[in-house]
Amino acid sequence: MKQPKNVDIPSERTVYRVMEEIGISHHPRRKPNGITKADREARKSEDLLKRDFHAEEPLTKCVTDMTEIKGCDGKLYVSAIFDCFDSSVIGLAMDTNMKASLCKETLENAAKAYPSIRGVIIHSDRGSQYTSQLYREAIQKYGIQQSMNSAGGRCHDNARCESMWARMKTELLYDRYDTEKMTTDELKTIIWRYFTSYWNIRRICSTNRGLPPMIKRQQYYASLKEAA
């Protein structure tokens, strides 16, 4: 799909200004706080990205992380894999626990949606979920290159993921829902819809020059066909 002709896509700054005028806040109210804990005894993988989150092609560099949201019946843990090429979510899973099985499920969902995922670099923090045998076996099964934050667990090493979680919570949750009055099943529904129906398909992204992730991806593959 190509960008419609004669349609001006507003800049992110313009969108934020209009949001301010109509009373919709876009400012995050909470600082991102990592929830995964490192297993000091576990084997770590090398930092292959070294804070370089730029990708010229889809499925070359991805980042993954988890975040938590409090509901009335407990916490919901959201795990996602973002493609650095266009900021799209290529894998998503949610559960009421933050075990390694949740990260494995996220990886499996990405592999189902994108069978060509083999060879991609997926970067994470050094949380025990990502150093677990269960997750490493899934990484090997799909031929993925595992990358992790450098020693010391510096938050900036996975800043791309932290930024995306902050945007999701700001746009979807803050000032719109009282999540602590919602069940985890209700939270699952709105978060799933947000990423699959809005984030990937309709949300403008400044790093994509104002294009939604899937539009940028489609234009990339269309350009390859034209060049062939």
Q: Positions of the model-derived regions?
A:
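Active-site beta-loop-alpha junctions of metal-dependent nucleic acid enzymes
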Residues: K70, G74, L92-P115, T131
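An active-site-proximal beta-strand-loop segment
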Residues: R51-I90, T96
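Mobile genetic element proteins and their domesticated derivatives, centered on retroelements
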Residues: V15, M19, L49, D65, ...
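C-terminal domain-tail junction helix/linker
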Residues: Q140, A166-A228
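Hydrophobic (often cysteine-bearing) scaffold residues that line and stabilize catalytic clefts
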Residues: S11, S45, L59, V78, ...
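Basic, flexible linker segments flanking DNA-binding modules
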Residues: M1-E57, C155, P212-A222
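RNase H-like two-metal-ion nuclease catalytic core shared by retroviral integrases
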Residues: I35-A38, S124-R126, S132-R136, M148-T170, ...
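Short small-residue beta-strand/loop micro-motif enriched in glycine and branched aliphatics
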Residues: D86-L92, Q146-N149, Y174-R176
